[in-house]
Design a protein with these regions (language model features):
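Rossmann-like dinucleotide/flavin-binding elements
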Residues: 31-65, 104-118, 125-201, 241-254, ...
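Generic secondary-structure signature for well-ordered alpha-helical cores
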Residues: 2-5, 17, 97, 101-102, ...
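Short acidic/His/Gly/Ser-rich catalytic and metal-binding motifs that mark active-site loops
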Residues: 20-23, 69-73, 132-133
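Short low-complexity, flexible loop/linker segments enriched in glycine and/or proline
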Residues: 75-79, 118-121, 138-140, 201-205, ...
Length: 330
């Protein structure tokens, strides 16, 4: 509902067809030809692809590296504020089970694993991993953590920390809440002109209300340029997009990045040469939910696609919407 206060249409994170019913009906039609579909990844995008494919009447097999479905949603649901997000996964799992989707958990699928299933279509929905490469340095920082580390509880938090938020999404705010609850003093820094630019008002307000009078300071229009070790602390070089002469340093005990994710796309590229379409998508047809028809090598046996964060760092709705547009006429 946040979107309507910014002059946008009302959409649903859970159901990408909501608000788009004229183009994408909620009732999925059956396919005239039954196909075998392999989906790699059981996050929101992968499960939506599996659900719709099964509704279409296809045989569907899902590979998932983790022991449970959910992907990044399972991580975000660790925060009490967002625990209900698991409903996105639970409902899709229920629907997939009803339609006899086969799940293979605890398997890091290799190219040969999916090829051996003799599929007609392979959909890569493997998501991504936190990005540690600052644009300015062109290298991964090996002396920092990510916001995922705070939410998962994998890192013991120090007293004085920096959360650098380039993505502007819920993850950084969740991290700040958790860090403060555990006793840390937080500087929340963003290169943007306002904090959490991807969180709209109705959702941002509860975060800000909870963080009032807590040990947090907000630093806007400041960009993290580089990080180096200085004694037993970290030295952050800080600049600004608004003043090329602005440059100073600050020290912290720990630095956490919220910098989006890098696609886990190795499997996709390993499969490209074996596919009919060489992984290519007709984006005009994709946007309109029309059947893909690109054939680059007719001697190969399957078509290959990728969705969600396996393409580029985005959000839950984007992954689900990708799945809907790709599979609704598959």
């Amino acid at each position: 509902m946040d979107r309507i206060y910014q002059g946008e249409e009302a959409l649903c994170i859970h159901n990408a067809a909501t608000g788009r019913e004229l183009k994408f009906p909620n009732i999925i039609s059956k396919s005239k030809i039954k196909k075998k579909i392999v989906v790699v990844g059981a996050g929101p995008g992968g499960l939506e692809a599996a659900r719709i494919a099964a509704e279409r009447g296809h045989e569907v097999i899902v590979f998932e590296a983790a022991p449970d479905p959910g992907g990044q949603i399972r991580l975000c649901a660790k925060s009490a504020r967002r625990k209900d997000m698991m409903g996105i996964i639970d409902w899709r799992m229920q629907q997939c089970i009803k339609k006899n989707v086969k799940f293979n958990f605890n398997i890091i699928a290799e190219a040969q694993d999916v090829i051996n299933e003799n599929p007609d279509t392979i959909i890569i929905a493997t998501g991504g991993m936190p990005n540690l490469e600052l644009f300015e340095t062109k290298k991964d920082l090996d002396n920092v953590f990510t916001s995922w580390d705070i939410i998962s509880g994998d890192v013991k938090l120090a007293e004085n920390i920096l959360i650098y938020d380039e993505a502007g999404d819920h993850t950084a705010m969740q991290s700040a809440e958790i860090a403060i609850e555990k006793g840390s003093s937080v500087e929340f820094m963003t290169p943007d002109r306002l904090i959490s630019s991807e969180i709209m008002g109705m959702n941002l307000t509860p975060y800000l209300k909870n963080l009032q009078n807590k040990k947090i300071t907000y630093s806007i229009a400041k960009r993290l340029i580089d990080v180096s070790i200085k004694g037993n602390k970290l030295n952050a070089v800080i600049g600004s997009d608004y003043d090329e002469n602005f440059n100073h340093s600050s020290t912290y005990e720990q630095i956490f990045l919220n910098y989006g994710v890098k696609p886990l796309d190795e499997l996709y590229f390993n499969l490209v040469s074996f596919s009919k379409n060489e992984g290519e998508v007709n984006y005009t047809k994709f946007i309109n939910g029309e059947t893909q028809n690109i054939i680059k090598n007719k001697n190969n046996k399957f078509n290959l696609y990728r969705i969600g964060d396996a393409v580029s760092s985005r959000n839950i709705h984007a992954a689900i919407y990708d799945a809907l547009r790709l599979v609704i006429n598959l």
